[in-house]
Amino acid sequence: MHSHLYTAYADTLAGEILLADSAKTEYVIVRPDAPSKVDEYSLKLLLEGLKQKTGVDFPVVSSQDVNNQKRICLGVSKTAVEDLGGNPIAELQDQEFVTKSVAKNIYLYGKGLHGNLYGVVDFLDHSLGRQWCVDEYHEKPAFKRVESLAIEPFARRCIPSFAYRMLGFPSQFNYQYGYNMCLTDEICKGWGLPEGTVSVFDNPVWVHTSFLYIPPDQGRGFDWLKDKGYFKSNPEFYGMNPLGQRVAEQLCYSNPGLRSELTKNILTHVHLIRRDKADQRPIMIALDQEDPAIGKFCHCDACSVLEQHYQSPAGAFYDYLIALCTDLKSSQADVWIKTIGYRKTQTQIPPKMPEGVKFPNNIIVVYCSVEDVINKTWQDPENAETYQNLRGWAKLTPHVWVWNYYLYSAGLLMPFSNMERMAIDMRMAKAAGAEAVQLELYPEDGFTPLLQYVYLKLSQDTDSDWKSHVRRFCECQYGPSAAIAEKYIWEVETASKTGKKNMAIIHPSVDFEGAFSYLSVDNIARWQKYFDEMNRLAEGDERTKKNVNLLRKSLDIATMGRWHGLAKAYPDYFTDYTLVKSRIGRVNLLRAATLTDWELKIQAGDVHKPLPASFDKYPKDSIYEFVPVNSANNAKAKTLLDPDAAFGYATTINNPDMPFQFGFHQNDTKTAGVGMTLRQQDIVPNQWNLYELGEIELTPNCMIWFSSKSWETNLELGGIFTPDSANRFRAYVSLKFSGKEYGGDGESMVLCDRIILVKDELK
């Protein structure tokens, strides 16, 4: 946030301002003449802060009730205008705010929906010494109580680096420090946010909306469209796949009937929003693609022509979007359309405007870095194309918002900071001309509070020293343990760049030999001892100990995942996993299965049954053994104890088929490798059987998959791909079948306890 002193009233900065003394005050707070919901919330914060700091209830008055009292003026009022010689916000930009003292009076004001709120927050933090580095889920803001409050004169004027900010989850802390998007009534209620938590835009739905407006099946879509089932009545509204078939995955934006129906439904939605609106905020309508289907929207001839016309895979979509927004601009100027620049096969690549066509300025493009290597910045060659496309978008429109990502799925449980990437990419986004940056961060423990704090500080001022924000956070959050906490944070930050495999956004499982190899046995052991010392230093300070152990949580989860290796290398230290588990506590339900599986593997013991005798003829260093992972997002068991299994446990096959199929696939080259189909005569139920899959050739992104109905049980093998070396192996798979479908009794189930690869040196 760019700040400077007002030199025009620098002569007023002499002498302390006594706000309260001996439980009394001579000050009144002057409310805005026409307070909004946000202003009422801001006033409440100001009153609470002054009460916590001084113990005094400051009286609140309106302009007509002001006499000659000393005063704190919040926002624009007749009193503030008279005192300051005119409307104080007239010269400000949107969201710019000023906090200043003039003689003994104080003025807190800003422009736009949240301007006054930002003025109050600045005053509480910088003049009253409020300490608050995390959201209220962890800790309430704190003031050092005083009997006499005298503050130095001040004058600050600030404007955020980014106009719009958003994290993956809302909170009072995030809202007060700049989270100003996607705060619908439902979200605010669901997160327990108070009255006065309001978005800049009225944006009822955020993302992945095309099927809300054109639902393929009855029961989907907005409430007023749930009786529609467009795929049955109008299959031509949906994209054509490469085989020439219409499929309900995306829309066919070149189709005139689709365009007409989609526009009608969008305008109906706008009408319904207006009917229920209680304010004058602009309306934001999201229109973008469905998430699961990652290929081109449509392969029909008309869409292909528009793809060439705009030199973008989504040419037909942009052609429709430009027509829609051109009409809206003339008929409903307060309506914005928000779309996403998402995936290179879809909308990430900006269109080339044909001769005479201009990209409308009522379109917001949320540019998503979903395909980046997320532990590397846009300065890295592997992510350079993402930044190049961002700059292309910024040349088309000033309304580009960058959507940056953290980790998903099981990866979210691991110690991972990614602060340098966040800081560098935010600065590069600002330099490219982005209007906003949002971070999809989830409310887990570990590094989340730190990341949200640094993100919000950088959103205020991208040029600020992000490392100093880390230090400030640690001092506030970890007290006497701050120095060691900061040391741990920097070591994780450095180590996380050294994984053996590039780190993607989604990690259904944690590969300690690949992207998460930086969580080595030695690193985990060293870091656990750091936390022992932090807890010793925090003895008697329950607040600090709580925060230290919240930071420790992700390390404890990683410790569970590597327990056998840790207990073997450090037997005197890692003696009882239940002590570690007891510290972890609550885990997000969607990721609790990972922790459950790891505990089961600990209980299985450090078992390793020998290979069959037929493998004795191979050199030991040419044989690799693995266990696949079931990454399905359901409540079914992913791992089961089995005393006869190679390692004492086995992975369940998600949604197994019959005949049972499994095989090898090169994901990066989209090439199917060897496969096997097992019929009843090939299966002996209730015992382990080894099947020779055949020869496979590894690539950087490849897998062995199970069940043609799912593939969600698989073994990713890109981590052992070696450039400039032989990557040919012979693969064997150990399976156990049970249940009626496979010739046994009871519920049908397929287990895999071991995949064996033998390196083939023959070319």
Where are these regions (language model features)?
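Aromatic-lined carbohydrate-recognition surfaces of secreted/lumenal glycan-active proteins
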Residues: 285, 321-350, 400-407, 437-439
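Short, surface-exposed tryptophan/glycine-enriched loops
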Residues: 683-729, 757
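Structured mid-domain segments that build the active-site/substrate or prosthetic-cofactor binding neighborhood
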Residues: 257-260, 268, 384-483, 487, ...
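Feature activates predominantly on carbohydrate-active enzymes
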Residues: 41-45, 49, 90-322, 329, ...
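Catalytic domains of carbohydrate-active enzymes that cleave complex glycans
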Residues: 458-690, 749, 753-756
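Substrate-binding cleft/loops of secretory-pathway carbohydrate-active enzymes
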Residues: 338-370, 413-418, 445-452
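Short beta-strand-plus-loop segments that form exposed binding edges in beta-rich domains
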Residues: 706-713, 734-746
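Acidic, contiguous N-terminal accessory segments
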Residues: 1-98, 146-155
